[in-house]
């Protein structure tokens, strides 16, 4: 009954005044012993009585904000004026300090700042990615000593006319042929319609008397024999491919002409291949 009275709000004084105890219908198992001469209770006058009149003096007499409902307990909200509301103005941009302004007025400034941060971040990421890719690619490139071996210098005066000399270049055989005037005229007179891989002799040489070729057969990679075959050029003993003095395929299973590497004449007596 006390809990109901506490939750009843403004009806609590009425309910507490009309509350009374009602004896239950069950009888206790053990009969209480009533003394023959009951003693009168002694009241401790030093302790205050918890009555409505004594507690009314301790109630808050200032204006309160109270909320009362039928199914909820009564609640009281006090006004705390000593609580300091945190201010985050130092962390906010100047464009958004005024809370009364519309967000559309500061949208351009906010977007500009966002674009600036995005642009700077993109440039930084691109620069870091460029350095990473450059280091990765440079680690796979050939070193200086390997690049030095990628080129070979050949002294042409050591090769007599009508002879072919073989060199090793990048792990492959390199043929340098000093042609005679007869061979030059013979190869220049060949019609392109007779060739499997049509290519004029002048398109394969920089100087008519010098022919520089990679000595690897275009069929299965065998090394041809110089000054041999039906056309007086090169002959592959593996499957019988015949090349002329310009390195063009004339007979046999090879599909293409012998490869011409990149070379440059530095002088009349020196050529650099590679």
UniProtKB/Swiss-Prot annotation:
Annotated GO molecular function terms are: 2 iron, 2 sulfur cluster binding; metal ion binding; oxidoreductase activity; ubiquinol-cytochrome-c reductase activity
**Domain called Rieske: residue spans:** 187-272
GO cellular component assignments: mitochondrial inner membrane; mitochondrion; respiratory chain complex III
As for PTM, the annotation reads: Proteolytic processing is necessary for the correct insertion of UQCRFS1 in the complex III dimer. Several fragments are generated during UQCRFS1 insertion, most probably due to the endogenous matrix-processing peptidase (MPP) activity of the 2 core protein subunits UQCRC1/QCR1 and UQCRC2/QCR2, which are homologous to the 2 mitochondrial-processing peptidase (MPP) subunits beta-MPP and alpha-MPP respectively. The action of the protease is also necessary for the clearance of the UQCRFS1 fragments.
- Cellular localisation: Mitochondrion inner membrane
The record's SUPFAM superfamilies line, in alphabetical order, gives: ISP domain, ISP transmembrane anchor, Non-globular alpha+beta subunits of globular proteins
In the bilayer, the protein is annotated as:
Single-pass membrane protein
Q: Which residue stretches are annotated as topological domain Mitochondrial matrix?
A: 79-103
Protein name, please?
A: Cytochrome b-c1 complex subunit Rieske, mitochondrial
Recorded source organism is Pan troglodytes (Chimpanzee)
